[in-house]
């Protein structure tokens, strides 16, 4: 079992296809660390990049450590910068948008584990999260 996971060592999954999609890196999950409580990963978004509005039955903590983001949770937009955590309750619509001029770097932690398998299925199919009608 791994106890230390560094960026670049995790499983990289391309959501939306490799050419025009966005990479998500899975760093901590049951398969590699034996965790039973959560999955943790990271992603970078270029200026203007976004994660579409979606929901899932998992609690999620987003932690921005570089850049500026608009994270919308349950219809309420929150402008956040470095060193900011955002909690997303289960089954609540949310999205992420890089509103800064630099790359947005963030981590996500989902509890319980399992959403890493959704990421794998989306990547295998060349899809991103399904878009939600406005």
Question: At which residue positions do the language-model features occur?
Answer:
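Short acidic-glycine-tyrosine-enriched beta hairpin
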Residues: 75-91
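Conserved GNAT-family N-acetyltransferase fold
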Residues: 43, 62, 86
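Tight coil/turn sites that cap or link beta-strands
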Residues: 46-48, 83, 91, 101
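A short, N-terminal "cap"/entry segment at the start of jelly-roll beta-barrel domains
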Residues: 1-37, 121-134
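Conserved short histidine dyad/triad with adjacent acidic residue
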Residues: 26-29, 41-56
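Glycine- and acidic-residue-biased ligand/ion/polar-headgroup-sensing regions
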Residues: 59-69, 74
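A short hydrophobic beta-strand segment most commonly corresponding to one strand
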Residues: 87, 101-118
């Amino acid at each position: 079992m791994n106890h230390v996971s560094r960026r670049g060592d995790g499983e990289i999954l391309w959501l939306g296809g490799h050419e025009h999609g966005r990479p998500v890196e899975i760093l901590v999950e049951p398969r590699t660390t034996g965790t039973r409580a959560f999955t943790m990963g990271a992603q970078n978004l270029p200026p203007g990049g976004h994660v579409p509005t979606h929901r899932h039955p998992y609690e999620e903590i987003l932690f921005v450590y570089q850049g500026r983001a608009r994270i919308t949770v349950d219809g309420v937009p929150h402008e956040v910068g470095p060193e900011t955590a955002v909690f997303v309750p289960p089954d609540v619509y949310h999205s992420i948008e890089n509103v800064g001029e630099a790359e947005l770097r963030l981590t996500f932690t989902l509890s319980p584990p399992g959403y890493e398998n959704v990421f794998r299925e989306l990547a295998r199919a060349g899809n991103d999260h399904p878009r939600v009608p406005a």
